[in-house]
Amino acid sequence: KMKEILFATGNTAKVDRFYEKLLKNGILLKSLKDININIDIEENGKNAIENAMIKAKAYYDATKITTMAMDDTMYIDGIPEEKQPGVFVRRVNGKRLNDKEMIDYYTNLVKTYGKDGKLNTKWILSMVIIKDDKISTYTGITNEYYLVDKPAKK
C-alpha cells in the first residue's frame, strides 16, 4: 500500500510542486481539498519553523494522518534586522502590499542598501513532518538570487 502524507497548505501550487516527485518515491501527497478539511489557523509563530509546526500540529491532531507543513522565510543580506521580511514578504508595517507596492518597496530597499544595484537574497525553507506523534523538522536554503533596483519589463 502506498504511503500517504497530508500537505497542510491551501496553496495548490505548492502541492503540485511536490506531488510528482513524491509519487515517484511511493508517497501519495494529499491536499486539504482531497480530504475536504480546512482549519482556520492563526500562523502567529515568530519564524517559519514555528509557523510550519502550528500548521502541521493542527492538521495532524485533527486527522492523525502523517502531515507535512512548510513555511518560507526571505532573508536579504545587508539590510537592518528590523527591515528583514522574514515570513512577512508581502506585509510591511502591518499593511498587506499589492504587487506594485511590493515592487516599489523592494526596489527602494535595493536603492538604499544595495551594491551595484543589487542585494543578495535567499529563501529559507522550514518543514515539519509529524508521523505517529513523532515530529521531524528541516530547515535549509532553497533559492539564492538577487533583488535588483530596476523591475523587469513584462
Pin down the residues of each PLM region.
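Anionic-ligand binding patches
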Residues: K3-L6, A13-K154
